A protein has these predicted regions:
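N-terminal Rossmann-like NAD(P)+-binding subdomain of aldehyde/semialdehyde dehydrogenases
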Residues: 1-108
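Structural signal for hydrophobic packing residues in well-ordered secondary-structure cores
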Residues: 23, 27, 42-45, 49, ...
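Residue-level signal for inorganic ion chemistry
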Residues: 34, 80, 141, 172, ...
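Rossmann-like NAD(P) dinucleotide-binding subdomain of oxidoreductase/dehydrogenase enzymes
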Residues: 98-236, 263, 359
Length: 468
């Protein structure tokens, strides 16, 4: 059954038109008003912190409150602080050099709000992945329509009521619904469309945006590999791999998806990962800090991927725990040497399952990574900086971390985004501000300017100026 009726489409269009009109009335939202908007986002995040944790717990069944605090609430508070601190300098016009034959004059770039922007967000970090692009769009002076995920209804309702406390609907509006609503949402002629979600839906969104020539940012997924070099102490790998993989039960776009270790080291890495995760969650089944899988559909998909690898002869290592009952929890799992053609090695896993395979040297590892779609993140484990750099040079990914996982996400001055099938465009910090603004080129000349000398009738002065 469709989750959309004609009334909803009309309402969505009406909100869009109201935002358009409001934007026309305030094309250059003043600095002080943008600061108010940023402060409102920060204040809402802090004020509703407990409600955000409750909503995430209700949507996932079990969602670690500490992980919600870390990855949704604290992240947003610090992103808002960063934006507030730097907005003034981001908004300044940027002067550029004027070539000698065009002098005198002033050339500069004005960063201007694009207008009404659409944001579509996923379920895995349902608060942060909606609020973070909203923050960037508001800092840029835009109006925002958000379509959050249908898989996290409690969080979507909460965000709608939170935002209504501080923003009129003609400034920030939330449209609730599933794929059909999403499809109608993407048909509106936004000034920018910002999509976070799967590569499959990213293609659909991109086509819809193209109909209106709407510029689009695609924050997608993919299989983010870990490449380990010979000089890395394999017994230490689990310390960081376990955190990267089992945070939010692996439902993280930049979670390490699979690991390629040197020959003879996969078992050590697997055992150190299981040992670390066992220490983190002595009984993962009852531990409130070990998150559940978001829906029955996702739960069944992950279990069937593990079973497929088991039937194909791969060795499965799992952390010990009691029976999770109906909690939709999957034991932290490591799979040794699954076949390359198994779903675990073909699809983005997006759950608490980590395949570990061996490579035949770094050239082989890079070749195998490069044979797949370009990943969102790539992790290099190498003691030697030279080795790490050679892996960076031999591969392409949206972002990368050396000797750790995921931490690049929290460095606000780094652009966050994918490349190829893992996305295009970026945000965070100034990159988010740039995404939602248009770089308008301005060249100011005096009333009489020597450029008149290159106008017809062409003659000696023209020849002199244009001589190559
Ligand atoms: P999804 O693509 O299923 O859904 C994302 C959003 O798109 C939801 O709001 C959904 O309702 C909407 N949608 C679904 N069909 C649509 C359509 N036809 N037209 C318009 N909108 C539609 O993704 P998901 O399952 O929520 O998220 C998981 C994926 O997102 C993973 O691949 C993950 O790697 C990726 N992801 C990427 C990032 C990133 O920052 N790059 C962050 C989180 C998740």
């Amino acid at each position: 059954m469709s989750d959309l009726d004609s009334k909803q489409i009309e309402r969505m269009s009406a909100v869009f038109q109201a935002q358009k009109a409001a934007f026309e009335g305030e094309r250059h939202r003043a600095y002080k008003d943008r600061i108010r908007d940023i402060d409102a986002i920060a204040a809402l995040t802090v004020k509703h912190a407990e409600a955000i944790k409750d909503a995430a717990a209700s949507d996932f069944g079990v969602r670690s409150r500490c992980e919600t605090q870390l990855s949704e609430i604290a992240y947003m508070a610090s992103a808002a602080k960063h934006t507030r601190r730097h907005l003034n300098s981001w908004m300044q016009k940027k002067k550029v050099a004027v070539p000698g034959n065009l002098k005198p004059g002033n050339a500069y770039i004005r960063r201007e709000p694009k207008g009404v922007v659409g944001i579509i967000s996923p379920w895995n970090y349902p608060f942060q992945l909606a609020f973070s692009p909203i923050l960037a769009a508001l800092a840029a002076g835009c109006r925002v329509m958000l379509k959050p995920s249908e898989f996290t209804p409690a969080m979507s309702d909460l965000m709608k009521s939170m935002l209504a406390e501080e923003f009129d609907e003609n400034h920030v509006a939330v449209i609730l619904g599933g794929p059909a609503v999403g499809e109608a949402f993407t048909k509106l002629p936004y000034d920018h469309l910002f999509y976070t979600g799967s590569t499959h839906v990213g293609r659909i969104v991109s086509k819809a945006a193209a109909e209106n020539l709407t510029p689009v940012t695609l924050e997608l997924g993919g299989k983010s590999p870990v490449i380990m070099a010979d000089d890395f102490p394999a017994e230490k790998a689990g310390e960081t791999l376990a955190f990267g993989k089992f945070l939010n039960a692996g439902q993280t776009c930049i979670a390490p998806d699979y690991v390629l270790t040197p020959k003879g080291k996969s078992r050590t890495v697997a055992e150190s990962t299981i040992a670390r995760v066992q220490k983190a969650y002595p009984d993962w089944a009852t531990d409130e800090d070990y998150t559940a899988v978001v829906s029955d559909k996702h739960y069944e998909r992950l279990n069937s991927m593990i079973e497929e690898a088991r039937s194909a002869g791969a060795e499965i290592l799992q952390a010990e725990g009691s029976d999770p009952g109906n909690a939709r929890k999957i034991a932290p799992t490591v799979v040794l040497n699954p076949p390359e053609d198994s779903r675990l090695m073909q699809e983005e896993i997006f759950g608490p399952v980590l395949p570990i395979l061996e490579h035949d040297g770094l050239d082989d590892a890079m070749k195998r990574v490069n044979a797949k779609d370009r990943p969102l993140a790539l992790y290099v484990y190498a003691k030697s900086k030279k080795t790490a750099r050679s892996v960076l040079e031999g591969t392409i990914s949206g972002g990368a971390v050396v000797n750790n996982t995921m931490l690049h996400y929290s460095v606000e001055d780094l652009p966050f985004g994918g490349v190829g099938a893992s996305g295009s465009g970026a945000y965070h910090g100034e990159y988010g501000f740039e995404t939602f603004t248009h770089a308008r080129s301005v060249f100011e000349t005096p009333v009489w300017h020597p450029s008149r000398l290159i106008q017809p009738p062409y003659g000696k002065i023209f020849d002199m100026i244009t001589k190559t």
